[in-house]
């Protein structure tokens, strides 16, 4: 068999075994593997001719690569520095690995890696192992699959943390100089799901936020416009909203945008979220409100209360709800008091957001919110919560990050970028940026727009406002 300038000889017995389409397919795969090895060997020969000055070849070393066409055994040359003094261990180089970007100590090629990482966002690692074997791919243990998923998931988590630090620690723009979108209204829905933990802590909370620009009609159903998911394991609500804000800052300029935030009664949503968006409208998710009302006071009374609330009569709603305490059964008092406490603490969050928007937004198609609940169930709970699964902190963070990329249609592009060469550890890069910023005019640095500074009430936010001369009222 000839291929332009190179001649490759194959064992004719490969084709002699062909009896039908299935054996022909296997023969073609075998020929592809032979061709793969032959080309690699020729490339290794060419690299020997142009080896770096001061290096010498000390022999060949074998390694096995698992590819989409099967396992490939590669025998490539090892090079070391040609020094006179012999050291116990000399660090070597495989020029072939460097040229082809073959990852050290990792046997999977990129095509197979993409497949198993994508499958792992939907199936358990053991199920992925079984699926690959049944499909005729090389045997990959569930432990190796777990290792790859964890590695790339944590890389994505580090990249998100890097962006958060760039925006909130340094104050540097993270938009990559792209033209930012300026929608009149942006919708954010937040929720959390508890998953099992392998350590002392019984459960871990995966926080998830969905942002979209509204709805469009597609046939008889409505579809979210430009939905984006941010999900992960965070140390409190502040870290989540800072990470979320950093991701939004890559896409949007929210200076003149009304931000509608919908979520359940969790404090990290109702109390903390408004601190990060100057023009925020926060509402309690209607599903959770109606559900808790029905559980606490019954369906008939809940309906009457919602009629008062939908009419904009917040005070009457809360007063009537409070007056019902004497007739609430003892077994329902806990949920009733929790609901009443929330309604009295956040009365401004009870009205539907559509009742609080100005007349200038009436021409926009506005509908009820609740996408986050569906996203949590479909994207997180199905993979991470059901079937008695439990996770380490790093494992949960990695899986949530990859599920986020998968949901956003970014998983393959992320894997294709080989980000491990760019963001291994964000701290050294952070220190370099801090050093560089220290040589410049600090007044310019402090004038950078940071989402939290215009509406937050935390002490550190007030201090930064004072340093930078922000005009926002405290």
Please describe what each predicted stretch is.
Residues 44-105:
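An N-terminal low-complexity regulatory-tail signal and nearby short nucleic-acid-interaction modules
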Residues 1-37, 79, 83-474:
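Catalytic center-proximal scaffold of phosphoryl-transfer enzymes
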